Amino acid sequence: MQGAFLNNRIILQSYHIKKRLYSKRTSSLHSRFLQPTYRKNICQISKPIFQQDLSTNTNFISKLKSPFSNLKMSNLKQPLVWIDCEMTGLEVGKHVLMEVAAIITDGNLRPVEEKFDAVIKLDEKQLSEMNDWCIEQHGKSGLTERCRQSNLTVKDVENQLLAYIKKYIPKKREALIAGNSVHADVRFLSVEMPKIIEHLHYRIIDVSTIKELAKRWCPDIPAYDKKGDHRALSDILESIGELQHYRSYWLS
């Protein structure tokens, strides 16, 4: 009798273990089993929100058209400060910041009403340090000429950006920095705009890391289409859209 009881108990435990393992596996890899049409529709939910052409924006702090533009400061939970910089190159100390943009979102990627974008005044000596890629790309986008015409110093931009961040996130070390390969931006900001780095948390959310993990662990997830015009504000919008893309397919 006791043997039969133990045998039944073992069978029951085995059933529950298998059920747990199966449920966990199915949940974590649910995106692999979605029908192609359904998966496509999931991604389309977020793309129109952020894929806006803002490369011609000339305002320092301006409105961001979004279904979530009424997000209030009191509702900003787990805030993220999305930052993107354009530089004359990638060598800190030799190259300098050209443009800095930022958008603040909550933890669910809903942006606040305002966005930040500023171009820094550079002299010809600083511009002459650009490599061939930067000369071509920033010349084509019009950023080089805007740096010549700008009247904002790097300290002007630092103070204005800090004011923008503090308006929504007054507490230090609360908001994480987010972006694509944002560690490169952080290196330049640490030197040229240390007040920004001091106010934000040391942890970062790097969308490029998630992209690389998705390629290795869920290679069937389609790539996120990016315009890639290498202007700071439009790059941020694409980064937010890209993270929404991976969240919809994989991380939900």
Swiss-Prot record:
Q: Which UniProt keywords apply?
A: Cytoplasm, Exonuclease, Hydrolase, Nuclease, Nucleus
Q: Which CDD domains match?
A: Orn (cd06135)
Q: Which Gene3D superfamilies match?
A: Ribonuclease H-like superfamily/Ribonuclease H
**Residue ranges occupied by any Exonuclease domain in the UniProt entry:** 81-241
Q: Give the chief site where it resides.
A: cytoplasm
Active site at which residues?
Y202
Keyword Nuclease in annotation: yes
Query: What task does this protein carry out?
Result: 3'-to-5' exoribonuclease specific for small oligoribonucleotides.
Q: By its UniProt entry, which PANTHER family does this protein fall under?
A: OLIGORIBONUCLEASE, MITOCHONDRIAL
Q: What is this protein called?
A: Probable oligoribonuclease
Source organism per entry reads Schizosaccharomyces pombe (strain 972 / ATCC 24843)
Phylogenetic classification of the source organism: Eukaryota, Fungi, Dikarya, Ascomycota, Taphrinomycotina
